[in-house]
C-alpha cells in the first residue's frame, strides 16, 4: 500500500508543473498546527496466576477513536533534516472487556473504560526526500512525554460503586512513522501516519478484581494527522 501511495503522489507531482513556495526551504524556522485522529489501546501482560483467579476466562482490548490537537515548531538542522517540537493535547479512550464464568456456568462480560486527556510534549526528527516539484516524502522518529490531566489515580476504590482501572498520570513513548509533504500555493500540507509505543507500565496495582489479573499495561496508539505549515 505504501508503494501505491508513493506512485500516486509522484504522478500528482508530475502533473503539477508550477513550483509553489519556492523559497520555503531557504528558511530555517517553520511554524504550524496539526489536526489528528488517533486509535489508542494498551499492550497488556496477564498476571502469572491469571487462569486461577476470580473465575476470569478472558481479557480483551477494544481500541477506541480519539483526536489530537498540536502546535508545530520546526528547525532545519541541515537540508532535508529537521527537528520538530509539537506540544498539544491528545484525547484517548480505551475499553477493556473482562469475561467471567459465573456459578451457573454462564459467561458474563464486564467492560471498563479508561479515558485520558494527555498534555503531550513530543520532539521528533524528520528526514525528508528532495522535492519533486510540489511533493516530498519523509520518515520520522522521536520521543514524547505525556501528562494525563484526567487521571483518576487518586480515586478511593472503597468508596466507589463501580471499581475502575487506575493508571499513572505520566507516560513516555517512542514515536515512529512517515508521511507526505504537499507544497500548495500559500502553505505546506502534510499527511502523516505514526505509531506511538509507550515504555512504562501504567497500571496501578490496587488489588481489585480487575487489576490483580493484569501485570502490565503499556500505551499504544496509531495516529493519522494533517499538518498545516507556513
Identify what each model region corresponds to:
Residues 169-230:
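Predominantly the C-terminal beta-signal and adjacent terminal strand-loop region
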Residues 45-60, 93-116, 149-167, 203-215:
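Flexible, solvent-exposed loop segments that connect beta-strands
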Residues 12-65, 229:
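Short glycine/proline- and aromatic-enriched beta-strand/turn motifs that initiate or cap beta-hairpins
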Residues 25-29, 37, 41-43, 72-152, ...:
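Gram-negative (and chloroplast) outer-membrane scaffold detector with strong preference
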Residues 27-31, 63-67, 115-121, 135, ...:
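Residues that define the transmembrane beta-barrel architecture of outer-membrane proteins
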Residues 13-16, 122-127, 178-179:
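Short, well-ordered amphipathic alpha-helices
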Amino acid at each position: 500500500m505504501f508503494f501505491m501511495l508513493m506512485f500516486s503522489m509522484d504522478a500528482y507531482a508530475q502533473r503539477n508543473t508550477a513550483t509553489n513556495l519556492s523559497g520555503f526551504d531557504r528558511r530555517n524556522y517553520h511554524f504550524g498546527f496539526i489536526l489528528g485522529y488517533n486509535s489508542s489501546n494498551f499492550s497488556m501482560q496477564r498476571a502469572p496466576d491469571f487462569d486461577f483467579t476470580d473465575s476470569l476466562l478472558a481479557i480483551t482490548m477494544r481500541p477506541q477513536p480519539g483526536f489530537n490537537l498540536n502546535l508545530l515548531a520546526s528547525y532545519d538542522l541541515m537540508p532535508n533534516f529537521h527537528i520538530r517540537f509539537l506540544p498539544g493535547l491528545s484525547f484517548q479512550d480505551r475499553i477493556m472487556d473482562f469475561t467471567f464464568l459465573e456459578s451457573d456456568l454462564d459467561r458474563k462480560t464486564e467492560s471498563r473504560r479508561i479515558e485520558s486527556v494527555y498534555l503531550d510534549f513530543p520532539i521528533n526528527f524528520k528526514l525528508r526526500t528532495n522535492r519533486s516539484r510540489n511533493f516530498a516524502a519523509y520518515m520520522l522518529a522521536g520521543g514524547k512525554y505525556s501528562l494525563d490531566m484526567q487521571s483518576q489515580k487518586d480515586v478511593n476504590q472503597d468508596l466507589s460503586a463501580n471499581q475502575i482501572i487506575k493508571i499513572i498520570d505520566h507516560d513516555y513513548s517512542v514515536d515512529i512513522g512517515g508521511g507526505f509533504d504537499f507544497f500548495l500555493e500559500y502553505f505546506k500540507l502534510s499527511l502523516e501516519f505514526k505509531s506511538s509505543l509507550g515504555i512504562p507500565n501504567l497500571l496501578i496495582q490496587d488489588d481489585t478484581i480487575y487489576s490483580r489479573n493484569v501485570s502490565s499495561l503499556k500505551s499504544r496508539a496509531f495516529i493519522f494527522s494533517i499538518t498545516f505549515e507556513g
